[in-house]
Amino acid sequence: AMKFLLREYKFLLRTVKKINFNILEWIKFFINYPRVQLFSKYHIAHHKINEADLTLCSTNSWKEQLEKQGFNTKKTKVIGTPVYDDLFKKTKGIEFNNKKSKKIKILFCVGGMHEHGLWSKKTEHELIKSTINKLIEYKDFQISFKIHPVTVSMDEYKKLIKENKWELKIYQKESFLELIKEYDVILTYIPSSIIHECILLRKPIVLLQVHNQSAIESEYNENVISVCKNLDDIFDDLNEAQNKKIDEIVKDELIEKLIGKFDGKCSERAANEILDIIK
């Protein structure tokens, strides 16, 4: 967790240098910003000290939160989430085959919670072990791990697999988009872009909510994604995910709430807003 924090602050320092803060502005920022973060009731501090000449928001809810903190509404623009523009282009016209195979192939996306200091390593590993041990009670599942390509140690999870004598594949650097073509259902407990991508691509997904510090965000709609709240029910939840009939209007409303527009034009909107302000 400390390494992650230091890396984030180094990035912040480089950013502050790039935008030409003078020494007094630099001191003021670094005295106030950590304090604001520490006492914020949000996971990201919404404070006037963060206001810029232009603030780009992914969703309307972000804009509303900032406006409540006194941000200038004229300087706050909603443009969507540019990181998904490339996904939109890659998946346009692609249909994913969600038909059941003889053995249900599960891609279990793990790791990241203790690395970011949100859980202890013991808590995260216990959840993983309990889940895998429950799944392997039945022979109808083929399970593989997918870990974060950067922030998670491959050696750590190889060791976990070896210690528990599991026969599992483990992926790290591989493209998630390519992997999910080979799997029937995605299983995870991590609050990450994986969840959003599954919703966008209409890929069956089950979110684990069996820990009292669950990572699942309240805005996830169970009419769109399946949630497992008890490992004894995980088989039913996996089956439900594969057979879920999703209302397109409900799905589109959830996408709008989570990431804004999914149209491949978020980067263009961001660039236009930046150009307008520097003219």
Spans of model-derived segments:
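C-terminal alpha-helical cap of glycosyltransferases
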Residues: 262-279
